């Protein structure tokens, strides 16, 4: 049995930094809906092929279920960095797992955790990613098996699970792991969760930002929503600006093509700087010196497009290529929490 050949890795106590696997951030491996999904995901881009299949009894593993894999990756990387031995066979309490991913610890939350483990185990993935030869495929489930542990007196001791070798190898490779913002676990929408992971994956490589064709994003997400609905939901995310650490924009090219762009958010600063007096000091204008300065994000048209994203993963970017000539006009909008700032 596989279990007998593996050493047990007990989850580390205390707080560890959340880490995510870049392959899972860049490609459509999970359902973005909270409703049960049975329809498979089929994705191809260059030499990358992915097929995700669900069992009718449980449905496809969701992007919320993937939080368990983020927990596992975080534990393994932290232990490895501390010089401890790790293993694909992991043990932890439901409390440790649930609190790490920002969930409650009620009986209902525990039952949801077990349902998530069932979906992760029953979802089947076939992919060409990180295969040594062209045309080869690797099939696995996100969890090979899991079980509840109990003592001799029947007292529950926690959970054990076995990770697939494909995922474990990615986690053990520093080049394939990124630290993510803990605020990610507070994102409630499936699309915004997927978008944060995609943006975080590319944001670490190009500090000047990134831009995507909306239809390309639609294909890349694996979403079952029609393109029109998908674009509407993206615009709503741009309006709300929920992604920790990043600002989102829509850009409209001269030909009418709509792009989604992002940039790293500026470092937070104090919104009010005391003047050392009890009263508001006039600034020479109708407003006070406490007024928020005009935003650097312009709502009006800009000329010229950004430089193409050539230095990063071309398979994840449908816009890579030679720069456009002629300097066509490009309109840029950022609709966020401070809509109308500086107007």
Language model regions located:
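Charged, alpha-helix-forming regions
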Residues: 1-342
């Amino acid at each position: 049995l596989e279990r007998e050949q593996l050493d047990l890795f007990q989850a580390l106590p205390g707080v560890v930094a959340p880490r995510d696997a870049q392959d899972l951030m860049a490609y459509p491996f999970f359902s973005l809906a909270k409703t049960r999904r049975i329809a498979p995901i089929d994705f191809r881009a260059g030499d990358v092929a992915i097929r995700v299949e669900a069992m009718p009894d449980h449905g496809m593993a969701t992007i919320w279920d993937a939080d368990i894999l983020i927990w596992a990756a975080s534990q393994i990387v932290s232990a490895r960095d501390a010089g401890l031995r790790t293993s694909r066979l992991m043990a932890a309490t439901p409390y440790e797992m649930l609190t790490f991913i920002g969930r409650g610890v009620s009986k209902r939350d525990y039952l949801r955790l077990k349902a998530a483990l069932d979906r992760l185990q029953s979802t089947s993935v076939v992919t060409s990613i990180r295969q040594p030869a062209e045309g080869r495929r690797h099939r696995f489930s996100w969890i090979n098996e899991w079980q509840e542990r109990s003592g001799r007196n029947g007292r529950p001791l926690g959970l054990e699970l076995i990770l697939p070798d494909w995922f474990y190898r990615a986690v053990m490779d520093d080049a394939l792991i990124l630290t993510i913002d803990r605020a990610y676990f507070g994102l409630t929408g499936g699309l915004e969760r997927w978008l944060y992971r995609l943006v975080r994956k590319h944001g670490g490589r190009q500090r000047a930002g990134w831009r995507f064709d909306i239809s390309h994003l639609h294909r890349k997400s694996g979403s079952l929503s029609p393109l029109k609905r998908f674009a509407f939901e993206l615009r709503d995310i741009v309006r709300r600006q929920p992604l920790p650490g990043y600002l989102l924009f829509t850009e409209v090219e001269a030909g009418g093509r709509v792009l989604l762009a992002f940039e790293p958010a500026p470092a937070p600063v104090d919104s009010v700087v005391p003047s050392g007096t009890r009263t508001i000091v006039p600034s020479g204008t109708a407003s006070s010196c406490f007024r928020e300065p005009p935003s650097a994000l312009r709502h009006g048209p800009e000329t010229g497009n950004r430089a193409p994203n050539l230095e990063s993963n071309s398979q994840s970017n449908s816009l890579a290529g030679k720069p456009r000539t002629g300097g066509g006009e490009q309109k840029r909008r950022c609709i966020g929490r401070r809509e109308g700032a500086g107007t």
